[in-house]
């Protein structure tokens, strides 16, 4: 096994990983940085993000407003000190991206244009047409090329991290092009591996978003926090799950049922102004959890449209006009034509909620470090405490760069101060990783990874979807336990050493099953409804701050069982309150403004 010596290793070369690498290189120009990715960096899932990235940019906006929208959107499960750090650093990172070449969309006067996104009361989403993730990732990638100390290991699949006496010491990866193993030694490792959306059958995620980093951290005793909170995006294409960005609704797109009725006005998102008034375009911009839940209720009422790929509602953009659609949403027009045969200029787009984002992830502190010294996590694979029970659209792209920078700087500092590990123990661990790989390759049985993965996805849709019941969650838990046993009998039929996807998909499935069990067990134990976790059973349909204003921590014990613990939520300035949107929120804002004015005059 070849060994590469580095100071810092970063797993994942998407937005978070690249930003961490750049920050590390700037923090210590002499540091040797290994950047490992199972795909070429520009194929990372960040490229699929369409809508935009949040940052205060207007005079009538403020850090306080961004903070409030994020905490309320997360149903008060956010770490408020983390949110405060985030909102104050977003504008700096957006400006930095512009200086590096990110082509933010502009107003006629040359200023940066911003959209309104769901759950945000003010336009603060920076965007580059509807290809924001692509442009951000391209900008970060080309910037990273300026730093020769960043050595890329493209198309390398990380098998496991190496830990000695509570401190990370590197990792073992497989060169997918050759089938050989490489040991990368480093006194700090940053996990930037993305979420776990592929544990669901229908999702908006790329094929690489399989929960690898979460699974590796979990196997070393690091808990996964708040895994019951999985966001369904309201507007995915039926069948494929391809995302119709929230930017569509930010530009004024509307959602209608089979009767052409804008049904969101029936679910607490109706505007204060009558239908048809200009302000009414924001009715569709409620938080994603509530908009997805409204679809479920429309389906129960029989107001959705049946198709061979499932029930849908319509996303209508026709009133925006051809010019605006081709200027602001060109990629959406391409996708709709290619995947559902619809020209958005002429007809509405069929959409349905689709699993989209993992709010939970690897537990970290406010500096992105886990319980293992030197092991950091950032981006969707992590739970730094930003999103709570429901993420607001456009906060995730901003999270990648704000906390990517922080993780890179903190990891560089940790690597510089770490002492030497036990060489014999580290080598023994690396040999153990190699042996487990051989055992998997030689495993005999009649099971197929693809069938198990398919059954896992369907089980998660059924038991851990938009609305949940104890019966369906228990059914999912039982099914996952069965699949874990069957996984032990998976047979690798491909014996090649070059791009053995049969082997790689099997390894991904192993991580996915472990992560899915954390999701299901965490959901069953949270006997309330909060954010993206909604229950239908009696006594659990409302938020319960007395018993469940706390984080769920899921551990995987040595015998393979999932064990749950809980930790407190850090509340600094904004105590829990009712979440209100639409006209109710407008009325509350007016009352607050009047109260402030009265106090000022009194």
Language model region names:
Residues 4-6, 15, 23, 29-35, ...:
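Glycine- and aromatic-enriched mobile tails/lids
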Residues 188-242, 307, 387, 393-410:
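Glycine-rich loop(s) and the adjacent beta-strand/alpha-helix scaffold that form part
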Residues 77-83, 94-110, 223-226, 304-308, ...:
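A short alpha-helix-loop-beta-strand transition element characteristic
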Residues 41, 216, 222-342, 410, ...:
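An anion/pyrophosphate-binding glycine-rich loop and adjacent beta-alpha core
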Residues 93, 98-180, 185, 192, ...:
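Conserved redox-cofactor binding core of oxidoreductases
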Residues 78-91, 125-142, 153, 203-211, ...:
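Short beta-strand to alpha-helix junction loop
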Residues 39-69, 75, 231, 245-246:
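Conserved N-terminal glycine-rich FAD pyrophosphate-binding loop of Rossmann-like flavoproteins
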Residues 3-6, 178-188, 371-374:
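Core beta-strand elements of the Rossmann-like FAD/NAD(P) dinucleotide-binding domain
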